[in-house]
């Protein structure tokens, strides 16, 4: 089980990414459309002025139940251990155990 501080830190990062997403995208778009280096530098400085945790790459994929970061399934948002337990308990609709 991950520490609660790590889970809360990741939630805070997710909130910041949602808050600054449109501003960050518009700055990147304007920076790519400009031709002069000076204008690009201005947009680059504006991007750097945004909070560091507002970048999407800072979010870590962690299981929302256990907080485990390794063996994470993106489609379900849980780790493989939790996935297995929930599948055996029939808590994930549409999943069947294969046998041949």
Curated annotation (Swiss-Prot):
According to its UniProt record, where is this protein mainly located?
plastid
**Pfam assignment, any one:** Ribosomal_S14
InterPro entries in the record, alphabetically? Answer: Ribosomal_uS14, Ribosomal_uS14_bac/plastid
Q: Which GO terms describe its molecular function?
A: rRNA binding; structural constituent of ribosome
User: Any keyword Zinc-finger?
Assistant: no
GO terms under biological process: translation
UniProt KW keywords: Chloroplast, Plastid, Ribonucleoprotein, Ribosomal protein, RNA-binding, rRNA-binding
Name the job this protein performs. Answer: Binds 16S rRNA, required for the assembly of 30S particles.
Complex formation: Part of the 30S ribosomal subunit.
Question: Which family does the entry's similarity section mention?
Answer: Belongs to the universal ribosomal protein uS14 family.
Full protein name: Small ribosomal subunit protein uS14c
What gene does the UniProt entry assign to this protein? Answer: rps14
């Amino acid at each position: 089980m991950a520490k609660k501080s790590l889970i809360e830190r990741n939630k805070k990062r997710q909130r910041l990414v949602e808050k600054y997403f449109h501003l960050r995208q518009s700055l990147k778009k304007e920076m790519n459309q400009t031709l002069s280096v000076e204008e690009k530098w201005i947009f680059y400085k504006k991007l750097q002025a945004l909070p560091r945790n507002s970048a999407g790459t800072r979010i870590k994929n962690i299981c929302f139940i256990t907080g485990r970061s390794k063996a994470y399934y993106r489609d379900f948002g849980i780790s493989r251990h939790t996935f297995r337990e929930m599948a055996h308990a029939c808590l994930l609709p549409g999943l069947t155990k294969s046998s041949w």
